[in-house]
């Protein structure tokens, strides 16, 4: 007759043995899936988001807002500042007959610089990226004549940066900056406030015309070198994943 105590001991030993074997490696010929690549690349949408986040963070940490705040607008507008006779001369000539002494404008101050959400599109052939960098600033035009601000303007401008994957002489592939320019038609200038007694509309129209001529290239010339610097400092893993997609023309910027 089989002893109950022996049965208990048998099952106890069996359970202990199975527990021990549970910690052993699974043989390679079994059909369980193997994790041969634990560090999987980001999904396409995740890759695009990681790129825009990295660029945005790099621009901010690289001093973009300070660059915008210190744009040398007054140096360009005042007499002798980069144009024949200076642009302020033409601007002030239209209103000084109404307001004597307005030629004493001494300051055009940039305030509240902003970097808005970056945009990203991919070329139809899949080999290029175009990053839209939307920027915002406020301009304050001051004069000692009235001891206050004449005008406050809100300005928005987009910079578009082309990103390419290129192969160097050592056959290494890098992300590089292609064309970097202001987006045509993206400059927006709006009046925030101005002193009522002054001929604001005439001053605004003249100043807007001048800013349309000089501001886009001024911003472009100061921001694009920083974009190039940020691009060279991107995380190597992120760069590798993006280069792989661009070289093979694979679409990973998903439009929703």
Curated annotation (Swiss-Prot):
Post-translational modification: May be N-glycosylated.
A family per Pfam: LBP_BPI_CETP
Cellular compartment(s): Secreted
Tissue: Highly expressed in lung, upper airways and nasopharyngeal regions, including trachea and nasal epithelium (at protein level). Specifically expressed in the secretory ducts and submucosal glands of tracheobronchial tissues (at protein level). Also expressed in the eye where it is detected in lacrimal gland, eyelid, conjunctiva and cornea (at protein level). Specifically localizes to epithelial cell layers in cornea, eyelid (basal epithelium) and conjunctiva (at protein level). Detected within acinar cells and ducts in the lacrimal and Meibomian glands (at protein level).
GO function terms (MF aspect): lipid binding
Upregulation: Up-regulated in response to all-trans retinoic acid (ATRA). Up-regulated in tear fluid of patients suffering from dry eye disease. Up-regulated in response to the pro-inflammatory cytokines IL1B and TNF, and the bacteria E.coli and P.aeruginosa.
Keywords recorded for this protein, A-Z: Antibiotic, Antimicrobial, Disulfide bond, Glycoprotein, Immunity, Innate immunity, Lipid-binding, Secreted, Signal
Biological processes, Gene Ontology terms: antibacterial humoral response; antimicrobial humoral immune response mediated by antimicrobial peptide; defense response to virus; immune response in nasopharyngeal-associated lymphoid tissue; innate immune response; multicellular organismal-level water homeostasis; negative regulation of single-species biofilm formation in or on host organism; regulation of sodium ion transmembrane transport
Region of interest (Important for surfactant activity and antibacterial properties), residue spans: 87-92
InterPro entries, alphabetized: Bactericidal_perm-incr_a/b_dom, BPI_fold-superfamily_member, Lipid-bd_serum_glycop_N
Protein's UniProt keywords contain Mitochondrion: no
Signal peptide: 1-19
Keyword Isomerase: no
PANTHER family: BPI FOLD-CONTAINING FAMILY A MEMBER 1 (PTHR47015:SF1)
Quaternary state and interactors: Monomer. Interacts (via N-terminus) with SCNN1B, a subunit of the heterotrimeric epithelial sodium channel (ENaC); this inhibits proteolytic activation of ENaC.
Biological role: Lipid-binding protein which shows high specificity for the surfactant phospholipid dipalmitoylphosphatidylcholine (DPPC). Plays a role in the innate immune responses of the upper airways. Reduces the surface tension in secretions from airway epithelia and inhibits the formation of biofilm by pathogenic Gram-negative bacteria, such as P.aeruginosa and K.pneumoniae. Negatively regulates proteolytic cleavage of SCNN1G, an event that is required for activation of the epithelial sodium channel (ENaC), and thereby contributes to airway surface liquid homeostasis and proper clearance of mucus.
Family recorded in the similarity comment: Belongs to the BPI/LBP/Plunc superfamily. Plunc family.
Protein name, entry field: BPI fold-containing family A member 1
Organism of origin: Homo sapiens (Human)
Taxonomic lineage: Eukaryota, Metazoa, Chordata, Craniata, Vertebrata
GN (gene name): BPIFA1
């Amino acid at each position: 007759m089989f002893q109950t105590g022996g049965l208990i001991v048998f099952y106890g030993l069996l359970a202990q043995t199975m527990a021990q074997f549970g910690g052993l490696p699974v043989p390679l010929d079994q059909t369980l899936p193997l994790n041969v690549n634990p560090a999987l690349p980001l999904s396409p949408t995740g890759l695009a988001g990681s790129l825009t986040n990295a660029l945005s963070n790099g621009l901010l940490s690289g001093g973009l807002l300070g660059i915008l705040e210190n744009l040398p607008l007054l140096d360009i507008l005042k007499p002798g500042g980069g144009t024949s006779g200076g642009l302020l001369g033409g601007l002030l000539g239209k209103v000084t007959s109404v307001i004597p002494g307005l030629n004493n404008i001494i300051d055009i101050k940039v305030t509240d610089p902003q970097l808005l959400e970056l945009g990203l599109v991919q070329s139809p052939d899949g080999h290029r990226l175009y990053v839209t960098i939307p920027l915002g600033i406020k301009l304050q035009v001051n004069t000692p004549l009235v001891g206050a601000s004449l005008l406050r303007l809100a300005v928005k401008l987009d910079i578009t940066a082309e990103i390419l994957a290129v192969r160097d002489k050592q056959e290494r592939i890098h992300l590089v900056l292609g064309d970097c320019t202001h987006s045509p038609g993206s400059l927006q200038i709006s009046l925030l406030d101005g002193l009522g007694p002054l001929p604001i509309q005439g001053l605004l129209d003249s100043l807007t015309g001048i800013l349309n001529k000089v501001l886009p290239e001024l911003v472009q010339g100061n921001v694009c070198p920083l974009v190039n610097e940020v691009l060279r400092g991107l995380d190597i893993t992120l760069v590798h994943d993006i280069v792989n997609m661009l070289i093979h023309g694979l679409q990973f910027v998903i439009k929703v």
